[in-house]
Structures are given as structure tokens and as C-alpha cells.
Amino acid sequence: MKDRFKQKYTAGAAVAYMSRKQALKKLQLTLKDFRRLCIIKGIYPHEPAHKKQANKGSTANKVFYYRKDINFLAHEPIINKFRDYKVFLRKLNHLKAKKEDEKIKKLYDNKPVYNLDTIVKERFPTFGSALRDMDDALSLCFTFAMLPHTRVLKEGMIDSCRKLTAEFMHYVIESQSLRNTFISIKGIYYQAEVHGEKITWVVPHERGLPHVTDVDFTVLVTFVEFYIAMLGFVNFKLYQDIGLFYPPQIGQVVEGDEMESEEYKEKVYSLAKPLAKRKDVEQTEDDEPLDLLGEDSDALAQKVKEAKNIKTLFKGCVFYLNRECPKEALTFIIRNGGGVVGWEGAPNDLKADSKNITHHIVDRPMDKLEVNRLYVQPQWVFDCLNARRKLPTERYMPGVALPPHFSPFTSEKAGDYIPFERLEELRSMGKDVSELEAAIPKTMDELPMRRKEVKPEKPKGIHIAVGQMHKKSKEKFHETVEKGQELKMRELMISKKHQRVYHSMKTTFKRNRNDALKLKKKAKLVKATAEA
């Protein structure tokens, strides 16, 4: 009898969820501080399965959180720091109104500051979990490193982003773990393999940016604040694993004020010189033979071979970059492949007229050319990394129309449009492309051309031939009809639950096939125009 008269909204979704307004009231925080707290702690809103029940009968649109998440936030010590900061602002405004400069300076010295180290360790209990979340952290920090500082974007935050991203790039260079790269409109995509985890991030193109006014940076700044604390931990662990000093040092070990000088920082973060290693760490040989046993031995052997090719890709090559080339991107890739790179004013003092230079990277016509070096455009370096070998330089010489730059992050499937150049590239990499070539769709305008070639000329005058029965075509027709009927019967057997998914897959397949036909027709037209 007791369960029969149970009160409504005391169980289920009504108890499991809490609206944002209720959460603000429980935590006694403003909306701005609540958002910051949720971003730092990794708490996100959820959509209830029974929204009306969670809203206690109301149909109004509300943002819901798990009640257990809000109870978890209520015990967070950082909330007290938010409240202390509000008190600090109140005192600051009071002293500014009185123009008491000495007290204002003293108040700034005692400004409340919170530390995110404990929260980082709490959100990432293992090092692998932190590496899996590095994609967004690196992309956002690289973006902020390019922005000018404003009232919201503090100078210290932008400097920290530049410092941490350069440190991570130094680690990738020293460990030679860069695997793929791609130049796009958004920026340059990189992919590195760190401790078995593939980390992909995008770096904006090097260009001057004005003050951005149409973006609300208040939320992004909170993300960056957390990612800065996280990257500090990750970089320290990565540097310790391969025996590097942290913070990074060049050549010989330095101490004191020399490390804080702008000239020394410029040398460190230019990526042109190798970092100093600790003497107490044993150097491991990379060329030790591996025991490739098991079902995936072939795939593992191929992976090891590719990694070895990348590490020695530019070994023995000395590159000189012209001033119009993207220095950071090219230096990153060249040094990852074991090459030496320099430019005008580089910290390694490589001169433009040096006899040791083997490759000169230019992006504009040159008046004077040296005989003892190769001149290539910047795309050659990117394509060499993706191809795992040094490509011929004839197609990348200055003033020559560059070949297509394909993305290594896309996997080719049978039935998709695959350009002829991409097939040749895959074939040169030793991959089997027979299935891809066999599944290339035929264009509609090729069929009439074949019919015209086979079609015999009509004889002059009226001629009536004896009718013949074509058994093969009749059998083929009946076979096609039977297959179509069988397919329709199988489609009728699909449950209603999966019919929508099936039709969506069918529509997607048709759309991809039509797109492939259009692209093939366009490529054929461009080729015919170029030949004409």
C-alpha cells in the first residue's frame, strides 16, 4: 500500500538530473564561475531520455546536469578561490576609488591564485589518458600562440602557449616520432606517434593576425588555462623518458640568469639546434633487432620499416631556407628526418654560400643558382615525409607546376574517386591497388563511345535480315531480373528499426558514387584541355 501512494517526481530522471539554475543556487556561484568550474573539472550537460519527467512535468527548455556531478563539484576547494577573487575585486575597486596606490600594490601582491595541478592528476590518472586528450590541447595552444595579446588574452598566457608548444615540437624532433603531415586551408596538420598513441593536431599558417573581435574568448581562455597546466606535466614526463633536461637546454648545460635571457630562449625555441641530454641516462640503440612473432608480424614489420625510413629520411642532407618559406614547419619535418637546417640569422650559423648545403628550399624565382645544390619548393619536404622516401626533385623545381598534395589521413576505399596521381603514389609505396583500380566507376559518356566503335555501318538501301534468338542476352536479362527481385525480397525482410539506417546507407553510397563520377569526368575534361 505504501508504494501505491508514492509521490511523483521522487525517483528516476527527476532525481538523477538537476537544472543549471538549481546547480547555481546549490553552489552559490555566478554563471561565469560555474562555466569555468565545469570546464576545469570536465563536467558537461546531459540530455535526459525523459526530459518532461526530469523537468517535473514542464516542457520548458532547460540545461540539465547529473545530480551526482553537481554534488561532486560542491566539494571542490577551487570554489573558495573563486569567492576570494570576488572579494579581491571588491577591495580593489574600493581602493582605486580612494586612489591609495600603496595599498593597491600590496593588494596585487596578495592576489588569490589557484593551482590546477591536483585537478590535472585527478582527471588523468594515467599518462596514457593524458596523451589521448592531447589533440585538442595542442591545437588550441598552437592557435593561441599565434594570437596577439589583448585584455582577455594575457601576455603571460600567450607566452606559455608558445613555450609549451615549442617544447613538445622539440620532443617530437628528438624522438623522431612525426609520422604524417598535410597542408590545408585551415593550417598544417601533423600526426606523431608517442608511446603508442597517435596524436594529431593542426598549426595555423604563419601570418600576421589583427585583434580578433568577433570571437568570445572567455570560454576558450578557461580551456587554455587547463591545457597549459596539463601540457606542463606531459612535457616534463616526455623529456624525462628520453633523457632531456627540462626546461630544455642547448648543447652545454647552463644555469642561472642565462636561461632567462631572450637570446637564449630564441635559440631554444627556434628548433634549429639539438637539445642537451643528461649524462646519467643510458643511450639506447634504435637499430636493435625486434622479435616479430604473432599474427600481426607482417604489419608490425612494415611499421618498424616505415619508422626507420622516417628517421633516416634526410640523413646527410643540409637544407637552407629562403626567407619566404615557413621556417618552423620545414625545420620541424627536416630535423625529424635527421637533416640539418638553417636560414639567414639561424642560431646554427649556416651561411647561404656554404659548400655543405645540399638542398635549397625556395618559393619564388631566383636570379643566381648554385651548381652544387638542389633547388626545390617547400611541398617537396612534406610529400617526402608522407611517402617515406626522398622523391625526385624534377617535379618540385622552382617555377614548375607542383603535383597534387594528397592527405595521408584519408583511407582509400573501393568505389571512391581516386585520382591517377594518387594511384601512382600508392603503387610506388608498394601497396596493392588492383582492387581500387577495378572498382573505379565508369562514366556515362564512355559507354556511347564504345558502342559507336563496335557499331557496324548501316548498308545502303532497305535490307531485312532473318530474326535470330540471342540466348546469352536473354539468360543475362532473366538473371538480372531474378537478382533484383531477390534484393527487393531481402529489403522487405528488414525490420522497421533498421529500415531507416539501410536507406540512409543506400543513399550515401549512391551520392558517393555520383560524386566519384563527376570528379572523374572533371579530371578527364581538365586533362583533355591541358593536352589541347
UniProtKB/Swiss-Prot annotation:
One of its GO terms (molecular function) is ribonucleoprotein complex binding. Residues 309-398 form the BRCT domain. Keywords: Nucleus, Ribosome biogenesis, rRNA processing. Gene3D superfamilies: BRCT domain. GO terms for cellular component: nucleoplasm; PeBoW complex; preribosome, large subunit precursor. The keyword Transcription does not apply. It is found in: Nucleus, Nucleolus; Nucleus, Nucleoplasm. Pfam families: BRCT_2 (PF16589), Pescadillo_N (PF06732). One of its GO terms (biological process) is lipid storage. Required for maturation of ribosomal RNAs and formation of the large ribosomal subunit. Belongs to the pescadillo family. HAMAP family: Pescadillo. This is Pescadillo homolog. It comes from Caenorhabditis briggsae.
